[in-house]
Amino acid sequence: MDERLPVFSQLSQRQSHFFMMKLILEIEPKPQSRPRFAKRGSFTTTYEDKNIKAWRDHCQLLIAKQYAGKSMLEGALKARLRFYIKPPQYISKVKKNQQALLDEVIPVDKKPDIDNYEKALYDSMSGIVFKDDGQVAMHDVGKFYSLKPRIEVEIEEISN
């Protein structure tokens, strides 16, 4: 590895004077769906699933409420995201899993992919917390089973 490139933890220590914000969104995480296509006469149009649109609108309201009065972040950003997902019954009903579910330490190793959750959240944050999700230069993302579904977000400016 190139010694000149800062690692995630080193950058955290050096850049601590920049703004950092935290959000806890009490909403069940949803993955971004693929665009849908429809043929209308000789034209093909794209459209978005209604469920993800409604979810994103609700998520934007929650973000706007918690982020009210703050200006949009500028420059490069570092994100730490935790998606807490309701476990399926075959996990939640097993007695030996109860404490692990309470501790929120069981990682989700099933579909949907983590980047689809991330994309849906970043799209909801764009225009409220930051101008564009392209500003996110570093990220630490995890998805875990929890009896309290939610999304926890930490965003930190690492340059401006």
List each language-model region with its residue ranges.
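Acidic, proline/glycine-enriched N-terminal capping motif
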Residues: 2-160
